[in-house]
């Protein structure tokens, strides 16, 4: 087993993962929650913007709006994390025995 070659391959894989992670963290994803809320979220999970359709804003029922916003943000975070995992997993070669 050539440990030097293995170390070089691991370093290359680490650099590739690091580059993809950095690119992903800066990427902005758009999520439309049931047509009511549009969320722009970066890969690092920073919310860039939240747009709410006026028809769901009822001053006498703020609880419903809060529930919709919470669900929309949670879904955006969940989908962004799944996207990140898919990208990272596609970068790691299968059968390496490391992951």
Curated annotation (Swiss-Prot):
The protein's name: Nucleoid-associated protein UUR10_0100
Subcellular location: Cytoplasm, Nucleoid
GO cellular component: bacterial nucleoid; cytoplasm
Similarity comment: Belongs to the YbaB/EbfC family.
Subunit comment: Homodimer.
HAMAP family: DNA_YbaB_EbfC
Lineage: Bacteria, Bacillati, Mycoplasmatota, Mycoplasmoidales, Mycoplasmoidaceae
GO molecular function: DNA binding
InterPro entries membership: YbaB-like_sf (IPR036894), YbaB/EbfC (IPR004401)
Role summary: Binds to DNA and alters its conformation. May be involved in regulation of gene expression, nucleoid organization and DNA protection.
This protein's UniProt keywords: Cytoplasm, DNA-binding
Main subcellular location: cytoplasm
């Amino acid at each position: 087993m050539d440990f030097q070659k293995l170390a070089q391959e691991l370093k290359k894989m680490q650099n590739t993962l690091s580059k993809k992670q950095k690119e992903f963290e800066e990427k902005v994803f758009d999520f439309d929650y049931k047509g009511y809320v549009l969320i722009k979220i970066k890969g690092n999970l920073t919310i860039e913007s939240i747009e709410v359709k006026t028809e769901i804003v009822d001053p006498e029922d703020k609880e419903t709006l809060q529930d919709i916003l919470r669900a929309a943000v949670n879904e955006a975070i969940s989908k962004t994390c799944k996207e990140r995992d898919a990208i990272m997993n596609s970068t790691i070669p299968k059968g390496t025995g490391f992951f």
